[in-house]
Amino acid sequence: MHTAFIRVKVAPEAAERAATAMQNLVDPTLAEPGCITYEFYRDLEDPSLFLCFEHWDSRESMDAHGTTPHVATFLTELGPSIEKWEYNHTAAL
């Protein structure tokens, strides 16, 4: 099992657009082979800070997710508004 924790900080003026774009990623990602969990969370004190929790059955499934059209669309729409992106790829002990 492979899990990713992603912290995304967007420009404050892009926060609502980011929330919508992230919501639009959920269903197509959950339909991908190997996806177990895919959830976004929004910080309660900073509405321009988001966290993503991804759980995949393999590294290959996780890596394939990054090449999908819906991820490409997301990055095209939000790329210029992303101020910081932290990605932590983990595996269970």
Task: Please identify what each model-predicted range represents.
Residues H2, A21, T37-F40, F74:
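Residue-level recognition of specific faces of alpha-helices
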Residues K9, E13-E16, T20, P47, ...:
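Residues at secondary-structure transition points
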Residues A4, G34-I36, P69, E83:
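A generic structural signal for short beta-strands and their flanking turns/coil linkers
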Residues H2-K9, E39-G66, N88:
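Short, well-ordered beta-strand segments in beta-rich or mixed alpha/beta enzyme
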Residues A14-C35, H70, L78:
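Short amphipathic alpha-helical segments
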Residues V26-D27, D57-E60, H70-T73, K84:
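Short, low-complexity, polar/charged sequence segments that are solvent-exposed and flexible
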